[in-house]
Amino acid sequence: MFDAIIVGGGPVGQFLALAAARAGRHILLLEAKPAGAGFNDDRTLALSWGSWLMLQRVGVTEQLEPAATPILRIHVSQRGGFGRSELTANDGGVSALGYVIGYGDVQRALAQRVTASDVRYHTSVDGIDQVDDGVVVHAAGENIAARCAIVAEGGGPLVATLGFSQREKDYGVHALVARVRTDRSHDGVAYERFAAVGPLALLPRSDSFALVWTLAPDDAQAVLGLDDQAFLERLQRAFGWRAGRFIAVAERGAFPLVLRQSEPRVRDRIALVGNAAQTLHPVAGQGLNLGLRDAWLAAAHLPKLDELDRARRLDRAATVHFTDALAGIFANDWPGLSWARGLGLAALDLLPAARRTFARTLTLGRL
C-alpha cells in the first residue's frame, strides 16, 4: 500500500513527490495531462529564497540555475504620494531575495527527478473514498489504495466533489501580464509600484521584465487591445522612468484576481495543498511559495494529516492575511491613507530592523 497518493503533477505536486521520496515515503503521483505537457509554459514564477533552498534539498536547483534570474533588490513605491523603500538581499541575510523563472523550466526540472515508477500521466482522478485503514482513489478505471491522499490540483472540480467548501473574495480587478524590455539593464532589481487600483510589478527575468499590472477589468481589456507603441506609452505613464524607457512588449494576457480558500484544509485522510488549498492575490508573490511550504511539511508528516493541519495553520493564516491586507491597504484612495502609506514606506526605508523583518517575510515566508 502506498503511504500517499498525490493528485496533480504541477510544481507543488511534483515537489511534494520528491520531498516525500526523500523522506522515505512510498508515494504515487497521478497527473491528468500527458508527460511534458507543461514544459513549454512560459508563465513567470517568483521563487522566494526559502523556496529555492527547499528545491535545492530535492536536487533541482542545479538544473534551474541557467534559466533563473536572481532578485538582488526590490524597489517599493506608491504612485501619486511620497514614500518609497528598497529591500536588498543583504537586508534578508541571503545571496538573493528570490529568483524569477519560467513555469516550464520548473516543471521540466522537477519531472526529470521524479522516478518513472512513482508517476502516472494521462490519469484523471474521479473520486476518493475514505476507508478504515486509508483511502481508495478511483482513477482511470482503477481503484488504488493508500494510507492518505494529498490533492495538489487546484483548477478542476475534484476539491468540491470531495466535499470541501470554498470561500472566495473577488478583488474586482484583473492582472494584466506581459514581458517588457527597457533600454537599460535591470541589474537584478524588481519593482513594486502601488496605485489606487492595485500594484504594478516588474520582475527581472533574463534580459527583460515580467510585468504584472493590476487594472480595472474594462481598463485591462482596453490596454490589451492597444498596439505595442500605445501600450508602452500607457505603461510608461503608469510606472514612470525608474527602470528606464520601455521599448518592447510581448506575451500579453489578463485574468481576474481572487482570494480563494478551501475549508477545511484537511479532512480525515485527505489533505489539500497549493492551489487546491488556496489561491492568493499576486502581491508580494507568495502563492507558489506558500504551496511549496505546504508540500514540504506534508512530506514530513505523512501519513499523519491531523499533525500536518496543525503544523501549517499559522503560516497559512499569516500569509493569506499578509497578502490580502497588503493588497487592500494600497488599493484605495481613502483620505489620508496615502500619507499613512508614505510614512510606512519611509519608516521601512529608515529603520533597518523593520526592513530586515519585511525582507525575511518575502524571502522565507515567515511573519
Regions picked out by a protein language model, each given a short descriptive name:
Residues 300-367:
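C-terminal helical "tail/cap" subdomain of flavin- and related membrane-associated enzymes
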Residues 41-79:
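N-terminal FAD cofactor-binding segment of flavoenzymes
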Residues 12, 35, 156:
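Conserved Rossmann-like nucleotide-cofactor binding loop
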Residues 55, 141-143, 149-245, 249-252:
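Conserved FAD-binding catalytic core of PHBH/FMO-like flavoproteins
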Residues 2-29:
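N-terminal Rossmann-like FAD-binding beta1-loop-alpha1 element of flavoenzymes
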